[in-house]
């Protein structure tokens, strides 16, 4: 295709998947196939533009194409950033998905399957992970979506990707409301963090202690507390007020994290209610309860 062609009027949906080794790229690739994407694994960065143009020309199922890339050389980050920039200059609007996980989680995953890290060489596993993170820094900065798989199993990761890309309109801003426990750490990919610990804790109500915020009893208790309604309404208005700006800036995915002490009662109830209210507006919203079952 001649240089400078404008492809902005095409309906090709292009996804670029990269991330750390052991993070779950293969699971992401399979999930994208499940929702109708034509997936090309281990594609060299130099062929990204050619692949995008072929997908546009081919039409049909190939119009939804995903390219999965991993670190193959020390020039990876520079090459990928340049390739993404070229795609945008040629009129494509790729979604860039970066799959990540905590170092400790990656080490456990490699040790559980008795594999060495591809960049480990003669050094330690942690050394290979550190080298790869350095090479991927520029690629991570380009990401529209950062999927942290530290606390996701294979099925949860698959569902997360299907929620993101299963709809035909893959360019719309999507919101995931994540409940979590502060004692387990704040989700690293959060755009907004809401602290629900000002509400009375159902843990101290004997008949509610063993139930979660997904139950009617706990939800009614939490949402009926003084300040709960104003809290949910304020964050609903805040998120609704920012979505148009995020979309103008090209942001595709928004993570709203709602925390309480352990991530079982208050944060879960608030997250469910917040997602429900956002879903009644123009926003596509879903929930993820990161720390349920960890206590």
Swiss-Prot record:
Residues binding ATP, per UniProt: 19-26
Ordered alphabetically, the record's keywords are: ATP-binding, GTP-binding, Nucleotide-binding
Q: Which GO terms describe its molecular function?
A: ATP binding; GTP binding
Q: Which domain of life is it from?
A: Bacteria
Any Pfam family matching the protein: RapZ-like_N
Q: Which InterPro entries match?
A: P-loop_NTPase, RapZ-like, RapZ-like_N, RapZ_C
Which amino acid positions bind GTP, per UniProt? 70-73
Q: What does this protein do?
A: Displays ATPase and GTPase activities.
Protein family:
Belongs to the RapZ-like family.
Q: Which NCBIfam families match?
A: PRK05416.1 (NF003828)
Q: What is this protein called?
A: Nucleotide-binding protein Sare_3328
